[in-house]
């Protein structure tokens, strides 16, 4: 399929193949996540300075891409990644002019080069459309869990609700019902134009380029001569503007260098040579002999008896403290136990009352509520597994353990209804938020 364009009746040497265009699009799509990953790594070291930048990454990246792409469209005639593949953009004609292109390539280039209005239209396609697509995808993914919670979390606003609630409701309706169809139409239109371009039935490989009347072509000798002349004129000028132009032009060298470094690191960490070096480095380490607690001097291989017996003494002291705490808890009154339970319990943000919870089980096979072996396992949204009847009754507030506890504490405690029995966190969707586990 790579040679299909060359098998057509009319051969156009300046028309790029579909696979060149797809490679360029893949490279352009890899830049945002790569920059985001590098920024995330740096933010972990310098969160004070870079946390706000990371939170506003999409907007700042779109602004930086707008500056870089505008410079490359004005000086190179193509986007940043298109220039890396030797491609350019030009205004599309109703008919081809092969004779004029062969006789006067410089004049044809000047006649078809992008005008200022064309540059802004292409910036809208290169920067604006991907930014809008990323935002819509993120909003759709964020709304997907809410759509699965049931009708209780998707109710329409009341008649007297503020306009923000009404707008948010209709926005969620758009993301849930309309956007999947729009997303499918987006990819289907791109696929249709790609197939039409592959079989030489269209001069555009993208519907957006068709809308703005721009097509992608291979760079000719006239384009390279024009770029060299432009760089020579920029080198003669002095000032901050020429320095900025040189820095933006130097990005074309940074991209292939970074790709080479990335591929080299990928090969290095996947090769056996790197594993052998790391293994040899680990073998050369001279580790001290271990110190075993409870052995006399010299038996541990390096530590004295005092150091060896220190962990045992600490354990014995810890056991004595635990026994003292248990004896004190047995001696305290019921009021003191109630006060300590209130201090340990989570507090509701709305009622400011302590929430009744149960301790986590020592064994993962036990249900925290009934303290027996789990039957008909069900997972809560907090990740804790219960018996399905136990957690279902707990969320509805009808479990016997809840009723017994709340018999004398009504108005002083929250029963834990609608919350996780161990953590006390609110379970979205109530019983609909439970997930049965099939083993």
Curated annotation (Swiss-Prot):
Residues 309-322 have a biased composition (Basic and acidic residues). Residues 46-49, 150-162, 282-439 are cytoplasmic. This is Peroxisome assembly protein 12. The keyword S-adenosyl-L-methionine does not apply. Its main location: membrane. The keyword Protein transport applies. It holds the Pfam family Pex2_Pex12. Zn(2+) binds at residues 367, 370, 387, 390. It comes from the Eukaryota. The chain crosses the membrane at residues 18-45, 50-74, 116-149, 163-199, 254-281. Pathway: Protein modification; protein ubiquitination.
């Amino acid at each position: 399929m790579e040679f299909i364009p060359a098998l057509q009746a009319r051969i156009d040497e300046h028309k790029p193949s579909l696979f060149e265009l797809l490679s360029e699009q893949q490279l352009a799509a890899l830049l945002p996540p790569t920059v985001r990953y590098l920024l995330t790594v740096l933010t972990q070291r310098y969160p004070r300075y870079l946390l706000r930048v990371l939170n506003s990454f999409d907007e700042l990246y779109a602004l930086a891409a707008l500056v870089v792409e505008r410079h490359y469209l004005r000086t190179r005639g193509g986007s940043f990644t298109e220039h890396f593949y030797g491609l350019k953009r030009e205004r599309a004609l109703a008919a081809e002019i092969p004779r004029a292109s062969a006789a006067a390539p410089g004049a044809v280039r000047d006649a078809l080069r992008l005008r200022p209005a064309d540059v802004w239209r292409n910036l809208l396609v290169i920067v604006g459309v991907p930014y809008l697509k990323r935002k819509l995808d993120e909003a759709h993914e964020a709304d997907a869990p809410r759509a699965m919670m049931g009708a209780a979390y998707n109710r329409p606003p009341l008649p007297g609700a503020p306009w923000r609630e009404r707008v948010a409701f209709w926005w969620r309706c758009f993301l849930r019902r309309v956007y999947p169809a729009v997303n499918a139409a987006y990819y289907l239109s791109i696929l249709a134009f790609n197939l039409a371009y592959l079989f030489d039935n269209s001069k555009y490989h993208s519907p957006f380029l068709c809308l703005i009347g721009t097509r992608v072509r291979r760079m000719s000798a006239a384009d390279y001569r024009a770029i060299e002349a432009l760089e020579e004129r920029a080198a003669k000028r002095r000032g901050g503007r020429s320095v900025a132009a040189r820095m933006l032009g130097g990005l074309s060298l940074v991209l292939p260098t970074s790709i080479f470094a990335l591929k080299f690191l990928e090969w290095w960490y996947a090769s056996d040579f790197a594993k052998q070096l790391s293994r040899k480095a680990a073998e050369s380490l001279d580790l001290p002999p271990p110190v075993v607690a409870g052995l006399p001097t010299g038996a541990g291989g390096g530590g004295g008896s005092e150091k060896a017996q220190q962990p045992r003494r600490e354990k014995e002291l810890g056991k004595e403290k635990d026994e003292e705490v248990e004896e004190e808890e047995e001696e305290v009154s019921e009021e003191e136990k109630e006060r300590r339970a209130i201090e340990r319990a989570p507090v509701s943000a709305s009622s400011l009352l302590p929430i009744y919870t149960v301790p986590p089980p020592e064994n993962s096979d036990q249900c925290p509520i009934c303290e027996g072996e789990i039957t008909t396992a069900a997972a809560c949204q907090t990740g804790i597994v219960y018996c399905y009847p136990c957690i279902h009754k707990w969320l509805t507030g009808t479990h016997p353990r809840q009723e017994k506890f709340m018999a004398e504490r009504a108005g002083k405690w929250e029963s834990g209804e609608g919350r996780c029995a161990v953590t006390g966190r609110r379970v979205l969707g109530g019983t609909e938020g439970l997930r049965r586990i099939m083993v």
